[in-house]
Amino acid sequence: MRSIYVLIALLSCQVFSGCGQPNVAAPNNKTLNPATTESIAPDGNQFINPDGMTIKSRILLPEGFKRPTYRVEEFGNFLENLPLYPIDQEVHYYNGKIKPRNNIYNSVVKLDIGKRDLHQCADAVMRLRADYLYQQKRYKDIKFNFLSDSKPRTYTSYAKGNYSYPTYWKYLEYVFAYANTASLHDELPSVKTTQEVKIGDTFIQKGSPIGHAIIVVDLAKDSTGKTIVLLAQSYMPAQEIQILNNWNNSTLSPWYDIDQDIIKTPEWTFYPKNLKTWE
């Protein structure tokens, strides 16, 4: 009888995390709803500068493309200047174990993810947006809706005047535990067409029971207006943010042309209707 009570208690305490509902880590040997591909393209390294230590300095541009110029206070400037680990660094899970490259990613963003299994896919997207706002001291703008009631939990209410980084990180883990792909999907407005994509936009699928989210961390255009983007993700179990390779076009990888009917990434398949933006 005691074991039954314990089981009921455990089930009632499930928390919701970024990639799924509830927060159940995927086994290491299982990929959820993977993108399908007949063959894995070789690592595209023609656009990789191994000495670069930010997204902008490491990922080179294809001929004819230019990055937009962002003001220092813009989200785009924050994202393309995200710090990276050395080129040979592999992704670490929250527990210190390593996620093999398997041609999934080419670079790892140098940001701490904590010691709990919380920093998953939508969490990483929310975290980057929050980190940008925190850096700009726009504390009142840091807020995310919870899955339970679709109401925002604000950083200012949580911090109560204490805007130190430890308090900020506690707030983020609070959000990670009770917001996920479903809540973020419903919170953000849709983008009408992928041709209108902006840096910082995110592809989100709510999923049933598991969803996924990735974020546009860089963008470039050519003289005709054609747009290419870099995509980044975290995943399950909680792991460091990684810049994704493009299995569909090894001559363009890691850049993506998302003006397609289907956007296949190494671990998930998205569609134009999944593109969301920040208000």
Task: Report residues per predicted region.
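Extracellular-facing segments of soluble proteins and assemblies that are Gly/Ser/Thr-biased and enriched
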Residues: 110-192
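Substrate-binding/catalytic groove segments of enzymes
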Residues: 134-138, 211-213, 222-227, 239-242
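Cationic-aromatic interfacial patches
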Residues: 22-110, 119
